[in-house]
């Protein structure tokens, strides 16, 4: 099947300035991400950035760049700018891969594209089971609850579903009911255009989760269980050191 991958790579980062260009074993992080995405079989790969240094690094590695504005409020807004500049048709399948995931398995990039293509829905994503209490109660690990058909009922930083009987006895174990959302999305290009036309929702401001805008406006997001678990993403200097060690 045919799909396009867009990799947003914003230069500014509060916790890790110049994040796309941090060195991981001799290469900028954004180049590692580009190499993983190439393994997915995507028809076209575009790095969306607001900084010339990132553009030069990507082009030196043979990648395609789309320069975007620096004032976008969300990654989806940056995607929408690329969709318009490139003139993608409404039915083009677009996969959004984060620029700070140098260990993302190629198989899940293709998986989210295929899941979207097989369904009459505008958006798809992935999740993995949570097995540790530490992760279940960590607000940085976004949880998702699904319906019987695999569509998202809600995303939250809170621990959902709350296992009343289990947690009344102990918070040391979590059972097998919690799912962690992975930050990879598949969209049809026309859906991205619609998304950015909607006003932000109260829920997305409360949770700081932009996918809640989709549910707020009554649209569906399909969620599949990922075929592979991604390695560590890079949000902080400590994450960077872990990734460097794991990728040696």
From Swiss-Prot:
Its main location: cytoplasm. Gene3D superfamilies: Spore Coat Polysaccharide Biosynthesis Protein SpsA, Chain A. It catalyses: 3-deoxy-alpha-D-manno-oct-2-ulosonate + CTP = CMP-3-deoxy-beta-D-manno-octulosonate + diphosphate. Keywords: Cytoplasm, Lipopolysaccharide biosynthesis, Nucleotidyltransferase, Transferase. GO terms for biological process: CMP-keto-3-deoxy-D-manno-octulosonic acid biosynthetic process; lipopolysaccharide biosynthetic process. This is 3-deoxy-manno-octulosonate cytidylyltransferase. Its EC number is 2.7.7.38. The keyword Nucleotidyltransferase applies. NCBIfam families: kdsB (TIGR00466), PRK05450.1-3 (NF003950), PRK05450.1-5 (NF003952), PRK13368.1 (NF009905). The gene is kdsB. Pathway: Nucleotide-sugar biosynthesis; CMP-3-deoxy-D-manno-octulosonate biosynthesis; CMP-3-deoxy-D-manno-octulosonate from 3-deoxy-D-manno-octulosonate and CTP: step 1/1; Bacterial outer membrane biogenesis; lipopolysaccharide biosynthesis. One of its GO terms (cellular component) is cytosol. It comes from the Bacteria. Coiled coil: none annotated. The keyword Transferase applies. It comes from Salmonella dublin (strain CT_02021853). Belongs to the KdsB family. It is found in: Cytoplasm. Activates KDO (a required 8-carbon sugar) for incorporation into bacterial lipopolysaccharide in Gram-negative bacteria. It is an enzyme of class 2 (transferase). One of its GO terms (molecular function) is 3-deoxy-manno-octulosonate cytidylyltransferase activity. InterPro entries: Cytidylyl_trans, KdsB, Nucleotide-diphossugar_trans.
């Amino acid at each position: 099947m045919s799909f396009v991958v867009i990799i947003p790579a914003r230069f500014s980062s509060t916790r890790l300035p110049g994040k796309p260009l941090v060195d991981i074993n001799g290469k900028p992080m954004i180049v590692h991400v580009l190499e993983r995405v190439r393994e997915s079989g995507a028809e076209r790969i575009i790095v969306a950035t607001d900084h010339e240094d990132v553009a030069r690094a990507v082009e030196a590695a043979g990648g395609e760049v789309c320069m975007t504005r620096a004032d976008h409020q969300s990654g989806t807004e940056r995607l929408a700018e690329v969709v318009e500049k490139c003139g993608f048709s409404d039915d083009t399948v677009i996969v959004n891969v984060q620029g700070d995931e140098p260990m993302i398995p190629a198989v899940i990039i293709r998986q989210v594209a295929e899941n979207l293509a097989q369904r009459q829905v505008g958006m798809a994503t992935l999740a993995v089971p949570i097995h540790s209490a530490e992760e279940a109660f960590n607000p940085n690990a976004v949880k998702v609850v699904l319906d019987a058909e695999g569509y998202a009922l809600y995303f939250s930083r809170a621990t959902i579903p709350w296992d009343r009987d289990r947690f009344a006895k102990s918070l040391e174990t979590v059972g097998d009911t919690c799912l962690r959302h992975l930050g990879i999305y598949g969209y049809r290009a026309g859906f991205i255009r619609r998304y950015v036309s909607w006003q932000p929702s109260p829920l997305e401001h409360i949770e700081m989760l932009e996918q809640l805008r989709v549910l707020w406006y009554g649209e569906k997001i399909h969620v599949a269980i990922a075929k592979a678990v991604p390695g560590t993403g890079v949000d902080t200097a400590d994450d960077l050191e872990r990734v460097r060690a794991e990728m040696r």
